A protein has these predicted regions:
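Sec-dependent bacterial lipoprotein signal peptides
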Residues: 1-21
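Lipid interaction determinants
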Residues: 22-85, 89-139
Length: 139
């Protein structure tokens, strides 16, 4: 009986360990991403809306992402509140500024991250069958 119990425990540990290890690694990756995004402020360094470069419309905006899933878009004394989330496995980041006008409402998409570094992120999203491109740089 003891031998069978031991074999069952061994069997369970061998087959559940990789799953829990993978979840642990994923959790660590998510924590690293959140720490990276929430430390410091960001600016839009490129926004291409279909074929039109509208980067200049974001001049002066600073974005502060917080670990609780909120983000502020700040220009001068005006702050616009929004939310954000990231999916490490899908390599996406989503933002939503529900009460925003242009240009901030143009950020209200799920963006596929195409390139990322500790101080910059490049992403794209499909809108009306055409890609919009976004680049953020850390201030």
């Amino acid at each position: 009986m003891k031998k069978r119990l031991l074999l069952n425990l061994l069997f369970c540990s061998l087959f559940t360990y990789p799953s829990s290890c993978k979840k642990y690694i994923q959790h660590q990756e998510e924590n690293a991403l959140i720490n990276l995004v929430t430390s410091g402020t960001w600016r839009v360094s490129r926004y291409q809306d279909h074929q039109t470069d509208i980067t200049a419309s974001f001049t002066g905006y600073v974005f502060q992402f917080r670990s609780n899933g909120t983000v502020d878009g700040v220009i001068g004394a005006q702050t616009t509140a929004g939310t954000w989330s990231a999916d490490v496995n899908a390599r996406t980041i989503q933002s939503d500024f529900p009460n925003a006008d242009d240009p901030l409402k143009k950020l209200n998409y799920t963006w596929k991250v195409t390139d990322s570094y500790s101080d910059s992120v490049s992403a794209r999203t499909l809108v009306d069958s055409v890609y919009n491109f976004l680049e953020l740089h850390k201030n």
